């Protein structure tokens, strides 16, 4: 029997069409437990489409994506996902703290609807790590783009998922917080499998052990790639 001991995701012959536009063309790849996959490529090259297909949020025109836990194929995995563009309605009256806490929806609450002390401490620690604890009671419609991005990143990672999928996590983040986000990502990589899309690879590429360029097809590089290219570094 074929062994999938280290494999956690298998992308098999994926093609995605939107009408007459081919976003992904016969993409094949594998992700192993503990990998840090850094993905770059030109705008419109299919990077976000690949992530959504890997997450089973988008059905491919052809091919399939399979998940594994050890030797067993499984229906799902525990993902933390930060999309490039959030589908959160900024007009919805939800606070920063409530958004971060929504990443713990599977946690048990007491009869009053409150989280356990341990969960509450995790919410507090996550908000501090993201630098959003100072405006925890602000509704999201009042946030800057960077503040909202850090809030959503907190929601994505608070449950300590097996796989963290980050689509342009530095979007809208003020320069003062960029190094902080890099530190958070490096910390995540110590305990989770990470898949990260970014146009800025100078730091991210050094963290990663796998490097992909997606331009409708997928190119797996043998060395780090530090700049936006359509070819791997030689």
Predicted regions: what they are:
Residues 139-143, 147:
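Conserved ABC ATPase signature
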Residues 205-206, 213-234:
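Conserved beta-strand-loop-alpha-helix hinge in the C-terminal portion
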């Amino acid at each position: 029997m074929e062994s999938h001991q280290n494999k956690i995701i298998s992308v098999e012959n994926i093609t995605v069409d939107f009408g007459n536009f081919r976003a992904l063309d016969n993409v094949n790849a594998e992700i192993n437990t503990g990998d840090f996959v850094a993905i770059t490529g030109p705008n419109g090259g299919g990077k976000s489409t690949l992530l959504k297909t890997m997450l089973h949020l988008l059905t491919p025109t052809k091919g399939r994506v399979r998940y594994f836990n050890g030797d067993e194929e499984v229906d799902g995995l525990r993902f933390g996902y930060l999309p490039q563009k959030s589908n959160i309605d900024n007009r919805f009256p939800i606070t920063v703290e409530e958004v971060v806490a929504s990443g713990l929806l599977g946690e048990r609450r007491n009869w009053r609807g409150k989280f356990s002390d341990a969960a509450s401490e995790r919410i507090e620690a996550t908000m501090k790590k993201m630098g959003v604890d100072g405006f925890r009671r602000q509704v999201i419609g009042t946030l800057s783009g960077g503040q909202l991005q850090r809030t959503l990143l907190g929601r994505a990672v608070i449950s300590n998922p097996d796989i963290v999928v980050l689509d342009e996590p530095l979007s809208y983040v003020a320069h003062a917080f960029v190094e902080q986000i890099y530190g958070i990502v490096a910390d995540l990589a110590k305990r989770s499998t990470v898949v990260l899309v970014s146009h800025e690879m100078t730091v991210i590429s050094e963290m990663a052990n796998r490097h992909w360029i997606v331009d409708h097809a997928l190119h797996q590089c043998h060395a780090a790639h530090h700049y936006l290219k359509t070819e791997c570094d030689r």
